């Protein structure tokens, strides 16, 4: 079975628990923290996949490292560890965040721009493009790419809206050539 499908099942179960316990915000915050901790400490994942370390020691490590996270998140991590699927945690986190955002009417987006965008500019992008994708609002991450020259390229899911100067120049070039 595809790893993404498996991760989505665990994420869905955790999401249901979050809704039942009315702790969606807290659990999402914990899931984001776990994802970031694992991204910054790749050797921790390697340590947990070491066959020389007993399951009990691995569980103790997870309990110690993630002592501050909520019980549902910690229990999910321990369950994944028992089932030798701890490597799914980053994908599970992405899937959980997507479910939480969908429930709130929020979409994740990345805005590529030649310079850092102000909060007002990010809000204006959110206001305009949220309606286009049928969401209440967008959570936009700004990535600076000077090669865009000017304008903005916005990625929402698998859609790309290219309003950059370099994108316009490429379109003009394609029209002239072919």
Curated annotation (Swiss-Prot):
Record key words, sorted: ATP synthesis, Cell membrane, CF(1), Hydrogen ion transport, Ion transport, Membrane, Transport
InterPro entries xrefs: ATP_synth_OSCP/delta_N_sf, ATPase_OSCP/d_CS, ATPase_OSCP/dsu
GO molecular function: proton-transporting ATP synthase activity, rotational mechanism
Protein's cellular compartments: Cell membrane
Keyword Ion transport: yes
Membrane-topology annotation of the record: Peripheral membrane protein
GO annotation, cellular component aspect: plasma membrane; proton-transporting ATP synthase complex
Family: Belongs to the ATPase delta chain family.
Task of the protein: F(1)F(0) ATP synthase produces ATP from ADP in the presence of a proton or sodium gradient. F-type ATPases consist of two structural domains, F(1) containing the extramembraneous catalytic core and F(0) containing the membrane proton channel, linked together by a central stalk and a peripheral stalk. During catalysis, ATP synthesis in the catalytic domain of F(1) is coupled via a rotary mechanism of the central stalk subunits to proton translocation. This protein is part of the stalk that links CF(0) to CF(1). It either transmits conformational changes from CF(0) to CF(1) or is implicated in proton conduction.
Subunit structure: F-type ATPases have 2 components, F(1) - the catalytic core - and F(0) - the membrane proton channel. F(1) has five subunits: alpha(3), beta(3), gamma(1), delta(1), epsilon(1). F(0) has three main subunits: a(1), b(2) and c(10-14). The alpha and beta chains form an alternating ring which encloses part of the gamma chain. F(1) is attached to F(0) by a central stalk formed by the gamma and epsilon chains, while a peripheral stalk is formed by the delta and b chains.
Name of the protein described by the UniProt record: ATP synthase subunit delta
Taxonomic source organism: Geobacillus stearothermophilus
């Amino acid at each position: 079975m595809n790893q993404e499908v498996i991760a989505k099942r665990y994420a869905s179960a955790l999401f249901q628990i979050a809704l039942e316990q009315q702790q969606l915000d807290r659990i999402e915050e914990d899931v984001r923290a776990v994802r970031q901790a694992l991204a910054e400490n790749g050797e921790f994942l390697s340590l947990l996949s070491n066959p020389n370390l007993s399951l009990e020691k691995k569980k103790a490590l997870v309990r110690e490292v993630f002592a501050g996270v909520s019980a549902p998140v910690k229990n999910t991590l321990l369950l994944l560890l028992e089932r030798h699927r701890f490597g799914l945690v980053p994908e599970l986190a992405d899937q959980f965040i997507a479910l939480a955002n969908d429930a709130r009417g929020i979409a994740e987006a990345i805005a590529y721009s030649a310079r850092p965008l102000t909060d007002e500019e990010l809000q204006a992008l959110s206001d305009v493009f949220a309606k286009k994708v049928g969401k209440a609002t967008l959570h936009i991450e700004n990535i600076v790419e000077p090669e865009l020259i000017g304008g903005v390229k916005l990625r929402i899911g698998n859609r790309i809206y290219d309003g950059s100067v370099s994108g316009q120049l490429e379109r003009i070039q394609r029209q002239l050539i072919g």
